[in-house]
Structure formats: C-alpha cells, structure tokens
C-alpha cells in the first residue's frame, strides 16, 4: 500500500552539501516525504497519499506526483493543495484500524483534527519530533522571545554595570586590605622591635639592680671601715694618753734624779767616803742617760702615734666622702630605675591601646567583608524580593559607614607607626642615658680606686703590722716596771733616798 523508498522521508540537511549551498534560503525545508492523509472536516475512512513538506512552522501538502518535481528542481511549489499552521498545535501518536502509525494534529482553532499516517515506526517518530518542534514557533512565542531577549539584555547591562561597580569596590577593598596588611606587618615588625627593646630594657634594669646591690655592699664595707677607723682612733688616743702619762712620770723621775745629783754635788762628803762617791755619781748619770733615752723613744712613739692618728683622720674623711659618693650614686640609680619603670609602663599602655584599636579595626573589616559578600550574592541572585532589597540596602549603608570611618581614621592610621617608632626611640634614648650615667659613674669611681682607704687599710699587711707593733710598743712601755725598779733601786742606794716618794708605784 505504501511503496515509497526509505529516502522518501528525509530532512533537507540530508542533501549533499554542494546542493544545499546552491539552494535559495526560501527552498530549505525541515522535512519532506509521502504520508497518508484522511480528509479534513468530514468523517471518512478513506486514506489518500500526499506529498508533505514542513517549512518553518507550516505543513504543506501536495499530490504525490509533486515529490518527483521537488527532488528534481530542488524547490517547492508555492501553490500547495493545503497549508496547515503548526504553531501551538498538539501533535500526538495514535492508532487507527488500518493505520497503526497514525498521527493526530489538533488545535483549539481547528474545526476538526488532522490525521496523518506513516509507513513505519521510525518514520512516525521522525515526523512527530519535527511536527512538535515546528509547533513551538508561534507569533506569541516570537514576541515573548523578543521581549525576553530585550529584558535579558537590559538585565545583562544592569548586571554588567553593577558588576563593574562591585569590581571597583572590590579593587578599593583589596587596596584597603593590602594597606591594612602592610600596616599589620609594620605593626608586627614594630612589636618585634619593642620586644627586643623590652628585653634589652630588662637586661639594663637587671644590671642596674646588680650595680645597686654592689654599691650597697660597698657602702656596708665603707661603714665597717669607718667603724674600724673610729676604733683605731680610740685605741691610738688611749695609747697617746698612756705615752703622755709615762713621759710625765719619766720627766718627774728625771727631775728627781737631777735634784738628787744636785744635792749630792752640793753636799760635803767625808774624806772616807770620797772613794765611794764617784761610782754612785756615775750610776746616777747612767740612769739619767737611760731615762733620757727612754724619753726619746717614748717621744718618737708618741710622734708615730700622732702621725697614725692624723692618717686615720684623713682616712676617715676620705671614707666619709666615699660613703657620700656611693649614696649619691645609689640615689641616682634608684631614680633611673623609677624612670625606666614608668617609661616601661607607659609603653605597655600604649601598646595595649594600639592592639585594642587594631583588633577593633579588624573586627569592623570582617563585618565589611561579610556585608560585601552578602551584597555580591544579592547582585548575582536572579530572584529579587523586598527582603533581599532591604538587606542589600543595609549592606550598602554598612559599607558606606565603614569607608567613612576608614577616611576619618586614615590620618590616625598613618600616624600610628610613627607613634610606635617614637616610643622605641624613647626607650633607646633612655637606655643611652642610663649607659651614659653608668659610664660617668664608673669613670668617676676609677679615680677613687687609687685612694680607697677602706681597701688599702684593710688589705695592707705592712700597715697592719705597724699598727700592731705600735700597740705592742705602747703596752710594753706603759707596763715596763724593770726600768722603774732599776731607777728606784739606784735612788734607794743614794743618801737621803728614804725621803724620796715612790711615785712610780
């Protein structure tokens, strides 16, 4: 019943490429072939063969003989037997008693249905697909498509504009973030410098404390030396008094001896005693010489003691000056420690304030980034509602406030590193001042090293031996009874000795 070949139903793209290029654009069709058609408008079971062409959104049909002319001339007849508009039509497959591969075309404006039939299932599927695709092309769809294209173009322009604005803001934000990052790196570097200065400051404070302890020990040593010098002064004073008393006694004894010699010289002696007198006179003269020698020794010892007392006085004054010097240095170190402690506390307060400000800026920056991301999501979203628009306006207001605050704080942000540098320079100047003070103190203290009475007095073995020897000589002279006994014995052997008092005892 249907003797068409397999190529009787073929789309125009299946033609050779050269032939397709030679055709006019108006002759290009989507699909052509021979189908069975039942009459329109009246009920009839008769099916007839027709040559059908799908051109754009229209179905044209001719007599079967037109197929040969179309394939030969490569263009279709503009006077078909009928034209069926496919726009908005519903195309579906169905089965008829004699045609298992039938197709129904219906539309609300048609006064009936159009029934077509193919020879095979493959051909039915091919025609159904093309008829359904052609039915989508309508005037309304064309107008809607144009309106949608214009709307999409307008939205694209708006989105491109908003995207450009967003990119500009993103670039500004990126520059701001880079600036914030650079300032944070600068702050971290300054923090490292401050940590190093803080450690150096603590080392300087520790050195000052050690020096203060050393000065304290030197003050204690000076005080002990002063106490020892005072004790020696007392002992030397006592020794001098003892020597003076001994000299006075020897002077009295010398005077008495001289009186005895004078009396013995003036007293007439018997002739029988003249032979005995020269020895007695010689003994008195010998004793007198011994007394004078002893007095010379005592005078020398007294002069030595007075010299030692004078040296002790000078050493006492030097120790007193040394103690005053160490006291002033200790007070200066204490003042330096107090100043350094105050500067350290001030620097720590400034650093804490800077860290607090930096944390607040970072928090506001994170909030601005969140608002920027929310604004980006709102701009990229295709669905707009009142809630999203309110949220976008709130994000824009938040970003505006953030940038205004950035502008207001720009000058302060620029000055913050300078403030931190100044704090570092203050610590460096304080360190230099302390080192200079310590250098001058050491320089001035070196002049005292050669004349420290405490060290020389306590460590000189020769001077210590001289003091001990002086003490022993003084004690020996003040307690020398043999000399006195010899004097009293000589005086007792002389005439009139019983009348002399025992002053030595």
Curated annotation (Swiss-Prot):
Ranges of Polar residues composition bias in the record: 267-278
Keyword tRNA-binding: no
UniProt keyword Flavoprotein, yes or no: no
CDD domains documented for this protein: PH_PLEKHD1
Disulfide bonds: none
Region span, Disordered: 264-284
Family stated for the protein in its record: Belongs to the PLEKHD1 family.
Entry protein name: Pleckstrin homology domain-containing family D member 1
């Amino acid at each position: 019943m249907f003797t068409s070949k397999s190529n009787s139903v073929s789309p125009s793209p299946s033609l050779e490429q050269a032939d397709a290029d030679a055709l006019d654009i108006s002759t290009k069709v989507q699909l052509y072939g021979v189908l069975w058609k039942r009459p329109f408008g009246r009920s009839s079971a008769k099916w007839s063969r027709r040559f059908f062409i799908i051109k754009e959104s229209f179905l044209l049909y001719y007599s079967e003989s037109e197929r040969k002319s179309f394939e030969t001339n490569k263009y279709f007849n503009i006077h078909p037997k009928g034209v069926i508009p496919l726009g908005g039509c519903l195309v579906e497959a169905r089965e008829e008693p004699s045609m298992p591969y039938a197709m129904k075309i219906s539309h609300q404006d048609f006064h009936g249905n159009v029934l077509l039939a193919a020879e095979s299932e493959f051909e039915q599927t091919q025609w159904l697909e093309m008829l359904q695709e052609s039915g989508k092309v309508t005037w309304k769809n064309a107008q809607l498509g144009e309106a949608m294209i214009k709307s999409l173009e307008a939205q694209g322009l708006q989105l491109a504009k908003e995207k450009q604005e967003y990119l500009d803001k993103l670039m500004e934000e990126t520059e701001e973030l880079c600036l914030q990052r650079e300032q944070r790196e600068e702050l971290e570097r300054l923090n490292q410098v401050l940590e190093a200065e803080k450690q150096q400051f603590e080392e300087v404070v520790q050195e000052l404390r050690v020096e203060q302890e050393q000065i304290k020990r030197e003050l204690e040593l000076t005080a002990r030396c002063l106490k020892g010098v005072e004790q020696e002064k007392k002992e030397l004073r006592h020794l001098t008094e003892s020597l003076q008393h001994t000299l006075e006694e020897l002077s009295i004894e010398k005077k008495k001896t001289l009186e005895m010699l004078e009396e013995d010289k003036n007293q007439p002696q018997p002739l029988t005693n003249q032979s005995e007198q020269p020895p007695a006179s010689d003994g008195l003269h010998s004793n007198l010489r011994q007394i004078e020698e002893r007095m010379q020794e005592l005078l020398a010892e007294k002069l030595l003691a007075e010299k030692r007392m004078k040296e002790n006085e000078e050493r006492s004054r030097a120790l007193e000056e040394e103690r005053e010097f160490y006291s002033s240095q200790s007070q200066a170190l204490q003042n330096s420690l107090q100043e350094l402690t105050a500067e350290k506390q001030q620097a720590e307060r400034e650093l804490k304030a800077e860290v607090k400000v930096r944390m607040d800026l970072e928090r506001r920056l994170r909030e601005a980034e969140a608002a920027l991301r929310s604004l980006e999501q709102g701009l990229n979203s295709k669905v707009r509602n009142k809630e999203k628009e309110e949220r976008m306006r709130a994000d824009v207001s938040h970003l505006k406030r953030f940038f205004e605050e950035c502008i207001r704080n720009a000058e302060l942000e620029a000055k913050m590193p300078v403030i931190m540098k100044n704090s570092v320079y203050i610590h460096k100047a304080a360190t230099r001042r302390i080192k200079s003070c310590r250098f001058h103190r050491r320089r001035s203290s070196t002049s005292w090293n050669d004349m420290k009475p405490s060290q020389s007095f306590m460590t000189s073995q020769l001077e210590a031996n001289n003091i001990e020897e002086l003490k022993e000589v003084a004690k020996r002279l003040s307690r020398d009874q043999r000399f006195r006994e010899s004097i009293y014995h000589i005086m007792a052997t002389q005439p009139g000795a019983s009348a002399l008092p025992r002053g030595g005892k």
